[in-house]
Amino acid sequence: MADDGTTFDASLTGQGGLGRAHAGAMAAHRTALAKVAYLGHDASDAAVRRRVRALLDDGLSVTGFMPHRRKPKDIFWPHTDLGETRDGDFLQRLRSIFSGAGLLSRADAFRGADVIIARNLDMLAMAFEAKRRARLSTPVIYECLDVHRLLTRTDAAGGLMRSLERAFVARTARVWVSSPGFLEHHFEPYHSGRYTAELMENRLPASSEFGPRPELDAERTPGPFRLGWVGNLRCLRSFHLLLDLADRLGGEIEIHLHGVPARREIEVFEPEIDRRDNVHFHGRYQAPDDLADLYAPLDAVWAGDFMEAGANSEWLLPNRLYEGGYFGVPPIAPTGTQTANWIKGHGTGILIDEPLDDSLPVLVAGLMSDSAPLQSARRRLLAQSEEVFVEPRGEMARLVQSVVDEMARR
């Protein structure tokens, strides 16, 4: 089970130089023997496991070196456990960087890797410390799927963290980001000219079986308007917006929550839901197995996030854009965000302005009386190429091979 509330089924198969990956069977063949040391931040995280599966499915040899927050099940790759980490315990995580680096520097699979992939800043620091101890020249890829709140602070602590990241970024072979917003608002302002980036959106993995996409003319399930909030249930403001929407519209609407709530952010969760007959919490779900049934009844999915307002929340592109898009469920999102830019660029959702406490109920009430805008967005979603929502086969192989080839030319 991941931080986003999903469980991954292991049985399923900057302007500083931005590029978009493409499929390539030849690339998969070329990298059949390439050896990857993958440093993930949490072996139990579904997104980490999906990435490892994608690397393996593209013919790469992967050895994982990862801590865990929950005891992981079904480790389906060669793996060295780096111990347990605790969310928010930064002193413990700092110590683990040095202890983990010592272990890595002595591991044959790390020393013999063709490329190192480090997911988040902790693991990037560990990778370079291990390289230093082992005196290696192995290229490192920095995989950045969120810009941590410590990196966006305006005080001395934030400046120190950005300085550390800058030093590491300058030594990486590539930076993989899941949103162009991270490049525009973080990497370019602070690390311009020091990196080469690849855009790696949070698309569904090519190896998974999610079932067919819905038909364009599929009939809506009768009943009240159904709005979903899917994935990482971490935003207190979103939670309150949806509860208020349920209170205002009563039996005309159902709110469906899928995932696991972030207890540090939303301290009172179940009691608020239990007070309302039209709010339903479904708990954890398994991706990709449950996605078709999860999205099938929904009329729209909420795609707003304010947990790190003014920073990461405005720059990211959430999984639900791609999951919902594949199944033809239009997103509703606030303007002024990277998510809104994505929706506008694809013409596949509905945008709303502040104040959301007023505009969201008005919007949903309007969609209930006239569903034409929603149906139009649904048709545009289903008319999009599958590749908009699903990662092409061979993408991981192409990206890794480009780094290996570059190293060989030096």
Task: Set out the residue ranges of the language-model regions.
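Conserved donor-binding/catalytic core segment of Leloir-type glycosyltransferases
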Residues: A37, W176, D217-R237, L243-A246, ...
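C-terminal alpha-helical cap of glycosyltransferases
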Residues: D3, T7-F8, G19-H22, E387-R410
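A charged, aromatic-enriched C-terminal amphipathic alpha-helix characteristic of glycosyltransferases
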Residues: E354-L360, S371-V404
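Membrane-proximal helix-turn-helix segments that form the acceptor-binding/catalytic region
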Residues: G102-F110, A125, R133, Y142, ...
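A short, active-site helix/loop in glycosyltransferases that binds the activated sugar's phosphate group
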Residues: R166-F210, N341-W342
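Nucleotide-sugar-dependent
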Residues: R237, A287-Y322, A333-N341
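Nucleotide-sugar donor phosphate/pyrophosphate-binding loop at the beta->alpha transition
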Residues: R95-F98, T138-I141, V147-F168, A206-P212
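Nucleotide-activated donor-binding/catalytic signature segment of Leloir-type glycosyltransferases, i.e.
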Residues: G259, E267-A300
